[in-house]
Amino acid sequence: IIAMENHPVRWTTPLGLPVVQPYRKLGRHLIKTSLQILTLQRETDKVMVKRQRTAFPPNFVHSLDGSHMMMTAIACKESGLSFAGVHDSYWTHASDVDQMNKILREKFVELYDAPILENLLESFQQSFPDLQFPPLPERGDFDLREVLESPYFFN
């Protein structure tokens, strides 16, 4: 919907980091010299509608994963734990794994207890007041707090 209006899809993560999908159509510019012809490719002002649409779901989920990682890293630091991570792999000293597992579950519940989709829709509506967005799906009945007791939630 947004890309069809020639705007890149953008949102703000739960931690306040702005994200803008950079996918724009490329244009060619020929430069002729006495020795050769060079072709330069540059982004145009037109967005790639299909790429904006297909990239948004995984990019949005990755931004939530990154928010969860940062929340976990900050909480580990505040608890005196060493923390390292790449994508969805989190590391600490072997003696601190149980404490880190507890922290990452707590931060997951904290993150997803927030009205993430509601906030996303509201930001889209504020940024594009003339566009009509579909309603959000209803929330399911899963008790997010079950994650706190799940031994295999994140392992």
Swiss-Prot record:
The keyword Cell membrane does not apply. It catalyses: RNA(n) + a ribonucleoside 5'-triphosphate = RNA(n+1) + diphosphate. GO terms for cellular component: DNA-directed RNA polymerase complex; mitochondrion; plastid. GO terms for biological process: DNA-templated transcription. One of its GO terms (molecular function) is DNA-directed RNA polymerase activity. Signal peptide: none annotated. Belongs to the phage and mitochondrial RNA polymerase family. This is DNA-directed RNA polymerase 1A. It comes from Nicotiana tabacum. The gene is RPOT1-SYL.
